[in-house]
């Protein structure tokens, strides 16, 4: 076969509409078909003035963000350039060929002047999720929770080391009440609440001393609201952490953004509150990983009438020493028995919520198992037990061994882990170009809203296509059934000849 060389010409005149040129199975048609985009107008109506020159349609602005995230473009400047030459994007936005595409800075100025201090992003996220629920795509009987980090727009080598106050945990007051109740039962004095800060002055320098717990953290010079993230073998960097919950079908139900140095077990409570405020009555099971197995989290979930499903957590003890589960707790006598059958009696309940059980030094001094039990110089073994330990034991020793656990927990890898993988790979969750916690919270809501919308649109499109195919099949079958009946009628009729 001879080689052919074509001299391309770009002066062809095409007499077609944009509607005809956009393929029927293109993603933008799925997105446009699954939801009525006019729902945005009531959400932003109070952010616009009743007088003045006409603005750019807010639906067009938000659709540009959806194009930016769903198709993984990332940059708004690049998104505007893509819209100029992409007929499918123009069709989705409702912009004709001779109409000018909005400038990339238009969205930035609208965010600064209108949308930044509003709740429109959360409302859009909720509206898309409600639409998915109305289609029957969301199953909230079991929810899956986890967090992932997103690298911040900050140099990891430019930071200052600062001393900051340790923030009070959300359950600290309830924990203190439980500690004092336990101490009073054992004849101990209750721990006082630090409701008012006492002013103490140093006798030598005369400076004010504050009775506040502090810690040293690294604060970025570029983005001070991000946090230094360092976990296992992952690269040490400044990042933001996204705590989310999704259903078994992968639809994101709630999302909260925090600094990257906040532990998952701390950010859990804010995201769990957002989830429960909306869907508490529908949730029966909460599935989490090993990082969330704390007495406070177990207590919170179980007291809400929900079951917590979590994996086995390896004991964090020194190599060569007895594990904590090898010390048997006697609930009746409120004591522990060591592997040598010696009693560890209750001593006190500390301010962290742990009851301390101590052995008799005389029993430990000549014990043949002391080398595997304790290395203390005073020959005394101390075992601690949290005041809410029974909730953790219910999760780890009872629920974890049920048949439901074997069905629910393995689905984590195909639900919430899939959400993180898709959003990082296709929807700009791996890095952020924005600086500041509020901006990244808004961005994360839009990313997960786009993820829900894309998932809903494809499921909706498949269901419509399947319905159409079934209708065609039933029509064809009915046609042949009628033909068959007619043939049978003719063949069974007696001849008059």
Residue ranges of predicted features:
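Amphipathic alpha-helical interaction elements
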Residues: 19, 23, 32, 36, ...
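Basic, short loop/linker segments at the boundary and entry of helix-turn-helix/winged-helix-like folds
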Residues: 24-66, 71
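A short, ordered amphipathic alpha-helix with a cationic face
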Residues: 5-8, 53-55, 97
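A general alpha-helix detector
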Residues: 17, 43, 60-66, 106, ...
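Anion-binding and metal-coordination hotspots
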Residues: 72-85, 95-497
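Short arginine-rich
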Residues: 90-94
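Hydrophobic alpha-helical membrane-insertion signals
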Residues: 1-29
């Amino acid at each position: 076969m001879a080689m052919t060389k074509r001299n391309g010409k770009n002066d062809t005149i095409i007499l077609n509409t944009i509607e005809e040129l956009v393929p029927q199975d293109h993603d933008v048609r799925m997105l446009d078909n699954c939801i009525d985009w006019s729902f945005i107008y009531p959400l932003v109506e109070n952010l616009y003035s009743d007088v003045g020159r006409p603005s750019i349609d807010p639906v067009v602005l938000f659709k540009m963000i959806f194009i930016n995230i769903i198709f993984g473009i990332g940059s708004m400047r690049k998104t505007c350039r893509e819209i100029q030459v992409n007929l499918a994007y123009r069709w989705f936005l409702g912009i004709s060929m001779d109409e000018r595409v909005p400038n990339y800075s238009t969205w930035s100025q609208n965010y600064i002047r209108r949308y930044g201090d509003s709740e429109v992003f959360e409302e859009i996220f909720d509206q898309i999720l409600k639409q998915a629920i109305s289609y029957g795509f969301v199953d909230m009987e079991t929810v899956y929770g986890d967090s992932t980090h997103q690298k911040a727009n900050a140099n990891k080598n430019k930071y200052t080391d600062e001393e900051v106050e340790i923030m009070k945990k959300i359950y600290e007051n309830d924990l203190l009440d439980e500690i004092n109740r336990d101490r009073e039962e054992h004849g101990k004095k209750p721990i006082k609440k630090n409701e008012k800060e006492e002013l103490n002055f140093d006798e030598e320098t005369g400076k004010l001393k504050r009775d506040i717990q502090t810690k040293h953290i690294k604060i970025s010079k570029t983005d001070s609201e991000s946090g230094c993230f360092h976990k296992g073998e992952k690269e040490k960097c400044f990042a933001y952490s996204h705590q989310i919950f999704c259903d078994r079908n992968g639809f994101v139900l709630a999302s909260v953004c925090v600094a990257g140095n906040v532990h998952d077990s701390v950010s859990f409570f804010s995201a769990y509150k957002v989830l429960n405020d909306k869907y508490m009555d529908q949730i029966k099971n909460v599935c989490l990983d090993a990082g969330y197995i704390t007495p406070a989290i177990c207590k919170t979930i179980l007291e809400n009438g929900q079951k917590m499903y979590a994996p086995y957590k390896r004991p964090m003890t020194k190599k060569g020493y007895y594990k904590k589960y090898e010390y048997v707790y006697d609930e009746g006598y409120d004591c522990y028995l060591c592997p040598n059958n010696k009693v560890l009696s209750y001593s006190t309940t500390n301010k962290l919520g742990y009851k301390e059980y101590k052995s008799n030094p005389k029993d430990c001094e000549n014990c043949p198992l002391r080398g595997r039990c304790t290395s203390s110089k005073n020959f005394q073994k101390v075992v601690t037990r949290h005041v809410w330990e029974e909730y953790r034991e219910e999760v780890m020793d009872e629920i974890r061994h049920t048949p439901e656990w074997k069905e629910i927990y393995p689905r984590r890898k195909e639900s919430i882990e899939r959400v993180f993988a898709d959003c990082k790979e296709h929807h700009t969750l791996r890095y952020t170009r924005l600086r500041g916690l509020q901006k990244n919270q808004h961005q994360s809501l839009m990313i997960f809203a786009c993820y829900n919308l894309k998932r809903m649109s494809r499921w909706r499109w498949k269901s419509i296509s399947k319905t159409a195919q079934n209708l065609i099949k039933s029509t064809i079958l009915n046609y042949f059934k009628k033909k068959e009946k007619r043939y049978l009628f003719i063949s069974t009729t007696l001849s008059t000849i």
